[in-house]
Amino acid sequence: MAKHVTPREKRRARIRRKISGTAARPRLTIYKSLKHMYAQLVDDTTGTTIVSIATNAKALRDEVKDDDKTAAAKRVGEALAKAAMAKGIEAVVFDRNGFDYHGRVEAVAAAAREAGLKF
């Protein structure tokens, strides 16, 4: 029996074939669940995660407790950009992970750009 592949998973695979991150310019990948937003910087040459942040992470949990989901996504973008700058990363490749560039995904990207990341 064939495995069911969702349209988002097809878009995700198509995007991942085209982009990859390096140590100098890692891949900023996001994931959104119905409740939380996750973002991380990945170096695909070594397969390691450089920076990771989420709305349910200890660092942001109390800050986003009273925010709506879009405002929480903005905080994730800001926090990720600050952590990346602290590690000397200024430019990234954006991987929307098959999600539409709209709403919370757009909020993370815009906040990261405003905080200084280039992509």
Swiss-Prot record:
InterPro entries, alphabetized: Ribosomal_uL18_bac-type (IPR004389), Ribosomal_uL18_bac/euk (IPR005484)
CDD domains, per database record: Ribosomal_L18_L5e (cd00432)
Pfam families membership: Ribosomal_L18p
An annotated GO BP: translation
GO MF term (any one): structural constituent of ribosome
Entry superkingdom: Bacteria
Keyword presence, Membrane: no
Biological role stated in the UniProt entry: This is one of the proteins that bind and probably mediate the attachment of the 5S RNA into the large ribosomal subunit, where it forms part of the central protuberance.
The protein, known as: Large ribosomal subunit protein uL18
Species, as recorded: Anaeromyxobacter sp. (strain Fw109-5)
